[in-house]
A protein has these predicted regions:
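Catalytic-core regions built around general acid/base machinery
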Residues: 26-29, 199, 244-255
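Crotonase-fold acyl-CoA enzyme core
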Residues: 42-87, 253-270, 274-343
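Glycine- (often His-adjacent) and acidic-residue-rich active-site loop
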Residues: 46-48, 61-63, 216-248
Length: 343
């Protein structure tokens, strides 16, 4: 195969590779510019399907370098169909998503966030995103607004004079940050990003803080990006630099050892991308997690291509993002996306 045969530009939306068959000379020798899905019917032995497929192999290339996710058949047949549907509907976003995951795998957090943001800005000007945005605008225009506005700041900040996370801990103060857009299920808007970044910047400068607790008010921790703000930016370069300048992701990563995030209900998009940078995520049993952005013609843009692979690996991240499917707290705990389930 040559590069042209492996690219979404030439109409190759994805590649399917049977991991139960021996490698052939026709298999890719470089990273294809489209998602590569490995399929296997081998029993799950606790070892990853890729590890099983490589054992005893003398392949001239490392399979894991270009297989983006592995599907276990027949158990994940429906999931495979969901993934193919997403890729087919948004091939450019899907190819960009797996490309970013591949490239950021060995980068630092700040470097990864730079790559993610540049890719996100690029896709904001893509036909796939513009089509999704147009379709959504037509739908929203037919639905009357009924919600009342939330009152007060979009991030509630409170400082406690002593740590209260553990009765045995008596040193240092605790900063609590609560997302406060309950009627919008704490949809992550520009104002929330800016207020969260401001509070975290202050926390970074305050060495007397021992703990930081982040939570959300209302029925959901965070239902993802505020869709009413999607497509508003007219300057992709300015939007990119704004994301890097006011970056809760980068700040949470710097403060991670101090941070506990308590999540519940919907944890969509930014609602899991940001917590994944923290040292500890405590989830209520009703928590659900999803990365729907590829279906919009975008990629996760709140740091998820950097934070989530560090918890669950590149392939599970690709599986989550390309399917758009949600997982419950139990699955998230098995993968390592969260650290504990607690009411």
């Amino acid at each position: 195969m040559v590069a042209e045969d492996q690219s979404v530009v030439s109409g190759q939306s994805y590649l399917l590779v049977d991991l139960d068959q021996p490698a052939t000379r026709n298999m890719p020798t470089s990273k294809p510019n489209c998602p590569v899905i490995g399929i296997t019917e081998r029993p799950n032995t606790g070892k990853s399907s890729l590890e099983s497929s490589r054992s005893g192999s003398n392949n001239e290339f490392e399979i894991s370098a270009w297989v983006d996710l592995v599907i276990q058949l027949p158990e994940e047949q429906v999931l495979l169909e969901q993934i193919v549907a997403t890729i087919t509907s948004q091939p450019l976003a899907a190819a960009t998503f797996v490309g970013v995951l591949r490239e950021t795998e060995n980068l630092s957090i700040s470097q990864g966030l730079m790559v993610e943001s540049l890719a996100y800005s690029t896709l904001q000007n893509s036909q796939g995103f513009r089509t999704w945005l147009s379709n959504r605008s037509n739908t929203v225009a037919q639905v009357p607004a009924t919600e009342t506005a939330d009152q007060g700041p979009v991030v509630l900040v409170e400082r406690n004079p002593r740590a209260y996370l553990n009765a045995q801990i008596s040193h240092g103060d605790t900063l609590t940050l609560m997302l406060n857009r309950p009627t919008k299920r704490n949809a992550f808007c520009a104002a929330m990003r800016d207020e969260l970044a401001l509070a975290l910047n202050l926390a970074l400068a305050d060495k007397s803080l021992a703990h930081i607790v982040i939570s959300g008010r209302g029925s959901a921790f965070c239902a993802g990006g505020d869709l009413t703000e999607f497509g508003q930016s007219q300057d992709a370069a300015l939007a990119h630099l704004t994301r890097l300048t006011r970056s809760p992701a980068n700040l949470i990563a710097q403060l991670r050892e101090k941070i506990l995030v308590r999540v519940h209900g919907a944890c969509i998009g930014a609602g899991i991308e940001l917590p994944a940078f923290a040292n500890t995520i405590s989830a209520q049993p009703n928590s659900v997690f999803a990365l729907p952005e590829v279906g919009f013609g975008l990629i996760p843009g709140a740091g998820g291509t950097v934070s989530i692979p560090r918890r669950i690996g590149r392939q599970n991240t690709a599986k989550l993002g390309l399917s758009g499917a949600s997982i419950d707290a139990n699955q998230a705990l098995r993968w390592g996306l969260i650290d504990v389930i607690k009411d």
